[in-house]
């Protein structure tokens, strides 16, 4: 970040009173003074340290307005299902031959989808795919026989919700070029997903402790959520 541009950004925004997203979006966009289309990102802290257990969330949210990113999707499936994946928009499709390429280190994709029957073979590559977050997972909808749905969802815009050991979750709501309505739609989808996840967890009190909204090269603002989750 250039020092000139940084000096022009507002200071101590994290200390300001939390505000609703509709009021923060214009402020955030005003601070997006770089030449590229910056991402508008959420930083969420959850109450994951419970007395009798530790909460670890891992799920996906389908962003109704999309993510603004072009995702390269790969599919491992039986030959008889390959055309379905291709027609849905998969960039790379293969079976045993593709698994061998992955084994040799060819990871030219950002999302990997696999059918249950092929997962037995693919699971042996956990040391390659796991550290990069590419291993398909039934909870994330990436181990499935419904390849059309999985590919379309991945292409249209999904975000993974996963907290670290300190309860932090980071994800993008879209781009600076998005309209306010699109950003709000995606934000509400994230809240709805977290609310559903909370109902499946042994949590006492609120799940969400704090939420901040920022841009790629900007500053953070504390976000007020419309309801306790």
PLM regions: where:
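Translation machinery proteins
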Residues: 22, 26-83
């Amino acid at each position: 970040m250039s020092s000139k541009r940084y000096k022009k950004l507002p200071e101590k925004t994290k200390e300001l009173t939390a505000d609703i997203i509709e009021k923060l979006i214009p402020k955030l966009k005003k601070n997006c003074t770089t030449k590229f289309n910056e991402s508008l990102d959420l930083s969420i802290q959850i109450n994951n340290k419970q007395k009798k257990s530790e909460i670890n969330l891992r799920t996906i949210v389908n962003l109704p307005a999309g993510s603004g990113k072009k995702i390269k999707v790969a599919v491992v499936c039986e030959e008889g299902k390959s055309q379905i994946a291709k027609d849905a928009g998969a960039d790379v499709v293969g079976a045993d031959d593709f698994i061998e390429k992955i084994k040799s280190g060819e990871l030219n994709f950002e999302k990997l989808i696999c059918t249950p029957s092929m997962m037995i073979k693919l699971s042996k590559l956990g040391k390659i795919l796991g550290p990069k977050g590419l291993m398909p997972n039934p909870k994330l909808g990436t181990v499935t026989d419904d390849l059309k749905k999985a590919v379309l969802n991945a292409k249209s815009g999904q975000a993974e919700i996963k907290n670290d050991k300190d309860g932090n979750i980071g994800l993008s709501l879209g781009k600076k070029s998005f309209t306010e309505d699109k950003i709000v739609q995606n934000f509400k989808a994230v809240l709805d997903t977290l609310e559903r996840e909370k109902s499946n967890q042994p949590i006492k009190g609120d799940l969400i402790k704090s939420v901040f909204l920022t841009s790629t090269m900007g500053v953070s603002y504390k976000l007020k959520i419309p309801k306790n989750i």
